Amino acid sequence: MRILLLGLFLCFGLLVKGQVLTGTIRNVAGEPLPFGTIWVSNLNKGSIANEDGKFAINLPVGSHQIVFRFLGHSPLTKNVEILASTKTLEWQITLVEQAVSLNEVNVGALKEDPAIGIMLRMISMAPFHMKELDSYSAKAYVKGAGKITSISKLMNMMVGKKLEKEAGIKVGSTYVLEGVNQVTYKKPNAIQEKVISNRNNLPSALRANETPNLRVTQTNFYQPKIFGNLISPLSPNAFQYYRFQYLGSFTQNGQTISKIQVTPKSSFQDLFDGTFSVVEDTWSIYSFSLHFKNANNNVTMQQQNAPFQGVWMPINYDLNMVLDVMGFGASFRYITQIKEYKIQVNKAFVVKPQIIEERLDK
């Protein structure tokens, strides 16, 4: 019940001296795109726009390639030359909604939804993707804000005044945090996060061992289960729990990206629904927007990936959560950007395996 993202927060800047690039990210209708990603490809660093689409990022002298991203929109790449005499630059960025083409695909002698073959390949490759790195390190820049939105009359009578007086928890108050985590991974599955810096106004009752930064970077959808017991759409048993529908594809940098609708077969289990975008040929996660709901939680999680040495790694997480627990209502939003990747590819997994699908059409 702790965390999250402040509406108007300062953008993440590159921690170097230099000139400032500022601007606003909008869609074609002129509406701001909140929390869009600004990525400096040659520096392996980036920033995030605020809730009004505004951004500011420091750039050192030199040539830079800037990539602007927002989920569901085509990335925009721009080049800039920063001189010693350069002052503040201002760009107005417009991102176009990603157009997907719905192509008819035949599998075997019969027609079937292309999502079936795509997801079979994704599921087959999931164990490979979990082993293709020996190690990596990165920094996770996090911003969050949340608040207690409501308290039942009964709970208010029982503990309302005590919570406010002793714990500093007050309905309607916004609690914010900003922090930097050092993330390290070593195979087979040892991932650690160390809090480098952390600033927040969270009441003591909402802090967890003085390190309230959520470990969203430890969430891996290639694993069969997420958050303990939620079935991943890439689980070996995913077809028992989900229906998949092909929504179309688009091409980016010569690679085909396919978009898949994910729908749970049962409403009585904790399952995801939403969309999954897949990099074909490597069968890697490009992005997703997935939602799950149960008696106490209503959660939406979005993730965007980018390639590093041929491996598609997460660069942005966006977590929205609405809670209703024991008479308390709360909401929060938590943004995490991963920067400064240093990865060591497992030499045994440099060459991607060829997937041969053998199925009998009936």
What are these regions (language model features)?
Residues 36-40, 66, 107, 138:
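Hydrophobic beta-strand segments
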Residues 30-34, 56-63:
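Short Pro-Gly-centered beta-turn/loop motif in secreted/extracellular proteins
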Residues 104-259, 265-271, 335-362:
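Structured extracytoplasmic
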Residues 47-48, 74-90:
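Structured interaction patches on ligand/partner-binding surfaces of diverse proteins
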Residues 43-54:
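Short, acidic Ser/Thr/Gly-rich low-complexity loop/linker segments typical of extracellular
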Residues 40-42, 67-79:
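A short, solvent-exposed loop/turn motif at the edges and junctions
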Residues 19-33:
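Structural motif
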Residues 90-101, 105-110:
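Conserved "repeat-terminator" motif of extracellular CCP/Sushi domains
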